Amino acid sequence: MTTITVLAGGIGGARFTRGLLQHLAATEPEAAVTVVVNTGDDMWLDGLRICPDLDTVMYTLGGGINEEQGWGRPEESRRTSAEIAAYGRGWSWFTLGDLDLATHIVRSDLLRSGSTLSEATEFLCRRWQPGARLLPMSDTPVETHARLAMDADEHRAGDLIHFEEWWVRYRASVPVTEFVQVGLESAVPAPGVLDAIRTADLVILPPSNPVVSVGTILAVPGIREALRSTPATVVGVSPIIAGAAVRGMADACLHTIGVATSAEAVGLHYGSRAGGGVLDAWLVDETDAGALPALAAAGIRSVAVPLWMRDSETTMRLAADALALGARSGG
């Protein structure tokens, strides 16, 4: 039985993994997939623990995602958020849907009752049946914050604000000097995460944000080391096509850490395992085929294929390309 581990953020990682599961259902139904999900976007809001990436992956794989926006539930209403706002509470820039609130309430109750985030996630997945094992990167609370380079509304230059505020409220338009993972120093991988990496036949870094999604997962002590030492082949899929982020504002994140917005630069940022990085192989889009020589020179086997996940067919084809590249790149 083939075992595959995916290190995923939100929308891009969720959609890729769905395509992977659909492809495997048709070609290798006995394959087992584990998804290690970024929890750096997590936060407390109005007494509830919000886990944006875990929920996006769970809803997407479980058939409950709002396909148009890529997050949240379809046919959602926001009456409760409106009532919270009427009390002068909550954040005007971050509203919680009424259906989505049920997930947050159940999760928060489980956490307050002594469950770990892993246990709460397992419980929530019993309803959604995502077809893969979902693991948070850590049960330790880790929250990504952005340090502002300039004043913004009530915030002053140098202040740290939660990543979701920078991402959702400011649409990554306010320059930042760094990203800080609060709580990272005491974090450990969640149970099963290291084993999922060490015992996999293939590890995939999907087209998620390389800085604050996959990058945050890799920053958890022990995970990068497990990737470097696993006997599995590690294949990445570029989140950059023709010099632009596929979704969101990943270019602003890359700029903050001094990495160019290109498939080549992100591949080199991850680095080859032979050179101390985490990649054996890297998929880039056909429009970025010119990057292949530089990537090969750095020890990263790369192939140019269509990367746009426009529908289930193209996403399944991309997943098949990742599997094929992994098979060709294995030791």
Regions flagged by a language model, labelled:
Residues 15-32:
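A short, Lys/Arg-enriched amphipathic alpha-helix followed by its capping loop at the start of a domain
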Residues 25-27, 37-181:
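Electropositive, gly/pro-rich neighborhoods at or near active sites that engage anionic ligands
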Residues 177-197:
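Active-site glycine-rich loop that binds ribose-phosphate moieties when present
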Residues 17-21, 213-227, 292-296:
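Short Gly/Thr/Asp-enriched flexible loops that form oxyanion-binding sites at enzyme active sites
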Residues 29-31, 230-234, 279, 300:
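A short helix->loop->beta-strand "cap" motif at the edges of active sites that frequently abuts
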Residues 1-5, 31:
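Extreme N-terminal starter segment of soluble prokaryotic enzymes
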Residues 247-331:
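C-terminal functional extensions of proteins
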